[in-house]
């Protein structure tokens, strides 16, 4: 489980679709590995994640950040009006429903940009041999990247409540793995991703609409779990 103008009917429709899967196990264990170390395998099976510090060079992370900013600015320049969502050159950009604390540029208002992995440095990252080797240990040899997103986490943005990623992807071809890269310091002050260790062993919980005023469309929340 992780945590980070929409009418009630659209929220209800979205959560009903998610909750049709309730009870499906959110992840699978791995037994034999070729590339992962024993400690990495143990972390995956026990905690549900593997943490690899300094996996990508700082210069490459900075290049990713600047490339995303350039993409967002291009989206807005090519749009005829102020929008909540932008589509340009195959990318989808989503604005925050609740404005961040400080806005100087359009990227300060953004929540996410989707569909980045087919080009440039993003495609370079997902095709790293060491990344693919580790994913192969978990997923098997046939690997496909079906989704990519850049999350801004600007100061004052709501972030997303506790949820299970598997609830958003009702596929019959499990398992699925998220390869998450921090392109800036992942600190509590910066609003880092939070994971509940061991929650991957649980079935999917009921996901309810995020009822905070100004929450983004598609944000759902698990409320039948004690996170204290």
Where are these regions (language model features)?
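Non-heme Fe(II)-dependent double-stranded beta-helix
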Residues: 2-46, 53-162, 169-171
